[in-house]
Amino acid sequence: MALTLTTAGESHGPGLTCIVEGLPAGLELDRDALNRELARRQLGHGRGGRMKIEKDQVTVTGGVRHGRTLGSPIALQVVNRDYANWEERMSPWPVDAATAEVHLPRPGHADLVGTQKYGLTDVRDVLERASARETAARVAGGSVCKAYLQALGVTVFSHVIQITGVTAPRRDDLTPEDFEHVDDSPVRCLDVEATKAMVAEIDRLRKQNESLGGVFEVRAFGVVPGLGSHVSWEERLDGRLGQALLSIQAIKAVSIGDGAEVAGVPGSQAHDEIFFDEQRGYYRETNRAGGVEGGMTTGDPLVVRASMKPLPTLTKPLRSVDIATHEPAEALRERTDSCTVPAAGVVGEAMVAFVLADAYRTKFGGDHIDDTRAALDAYKLRIGYRPR
């Protein structure tokens, strides 16, 4: 059965909902682990005032009993505490009080095109759903996908490798142990010196009323070879990873392995040579492909990078047009963050976890998690899989 993850809710509405459907029964979930993932999404130097209001916690309203999944859809809810300050403006039902419409779309946001597409006169009807606040629901759902993957021996991590012009040294030798303390960095960067430079860059540009983008990297370890397929374009795992990560607000580019870098080197330097011995089975000494060849996982660590643009909500707004009068105006001023690349990495983990969980469900099925494990073990035996 295919796995689905659906979210609902607006940024300043009563709350956010996530429905995850397609996971087997018998999977153990830890409430504290789910809440830790939500807390991680709120990390990062450069966050705005809303993080002082929201202390995200997940409430499970379906699909789980006594800490185990039932095989039915899993319903997760995250309350928006800030709704108390927006109750009249964001009420689902008509209110007596007058609420002013927003007519000033922000360049780089969904505001203008959203009002055109859906025939709306109030930009808030677009921006509330388009907001990255929606990713809290994705992280809640992704945390369940992570639990499923962990039950099958797969772990997913992320770290920040660039903020504007500050880039951390490249590391190709990372292991799961290297990520144990990544969240201790205020920008979730593994390099101490790069962390200091990134923090300084955020502080410098924030004083200039600027926002900052950057690049985060997601790595998955313990992934079995053969997830995805070469036979149909829509089953190619690299395509599915790209779509999932590009769906995150403000993400503009995705690369797998060496990505765009291979366009500038000859073929002998672009691919991973294949070797074999009795102890290791098939193996590669390099991982330029990032764990994906021909639309399928190779069994090497999955390495995916996503590039995030600076946030379009600026404290010094860009030029825009009032959609009610068509007169020139400054774009909407809205409470915002300066830099959310560290948090976006956590969202990236959730989306990669969802894609991998769906791939495992598609390939190994199972009504109960034990059925899935048995199918996975049989597959590993058939292909002579050795852990890497």
Spell out what each predicted region is.
Residues 1-388:
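Generic N-terminal targeting/processing segments that precede catalytic cores or assembly contacts
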